[in-house]
Amino acid sequence: ENSTLTLEDTEKILSGGTLARNVNVREVFEAKKLATLTESLLEKNNSALNIKRILALHKTLLTNIDEPIAGRFRTGKEWVRVGNHLGSNPQFVPALIQELVDHYNQHKSLYFLDAVAHFHAEFETIHPFVDGNGRMGRVLINLQLMHLGLPPIIIQNKSKHTEYYPLFTQYQSTMKFGGFTELFALLLQESLHKRITILTAKKIIPLSKWALQKGVKPNIAANKAKRQTIPAFRMREKWMIDEAYSPSN
């Protein structure tokens, strides 16, 4: 979040390469830590969601980056503000997160994406940490999905300001989280389409090329991809699809 690193920069860092430009050392550490955190989810995705695990994940995220605040909630006078939103009073943060975790674990009859969406909206509204709230919130989404046997989702950087951040303003003024449910449903479909296509497609091509081959207007193809009415998905933030896919399939 708020990083100047490009996708290509991040890939070079994680593969041990050297960047051709100077970057903030903290951002390099943050990229590596987030990768480590993601790997840990793959190894331990059956663990239940609880306070201990949330704090352990946060500690992994910020160790060697900001040790004094790693692995603990805000306390004392550690107030945080994001735009016009003021995070919850530090005095009540531990209790608020415990209530949120209990609500998530106890309401098993709730539609699973509604449960994940509500948890995420409320977690970010509380903003329990001094730093790393956005990254932690998105990590927890994937922890919850993977615990249900589903693949992780990616909230694309390019569309955050138009499709993701406005949903928080809506939630904080109305307490309605349906927008998050709808967004996560689309991203989950995209994640599944991506995995199925990678495993089954003979050739994967850009959506723009596919549209040209099939005689579909590019803007119509793009809209279908965004609505997930065709099995398109993003790689390096570019829409892709199985070359053999036909709209009549």
Functional labels for PLM-detected ranges:
Residues E1-D131, R135-N249:
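FIC/Doc superfamily catalytic core
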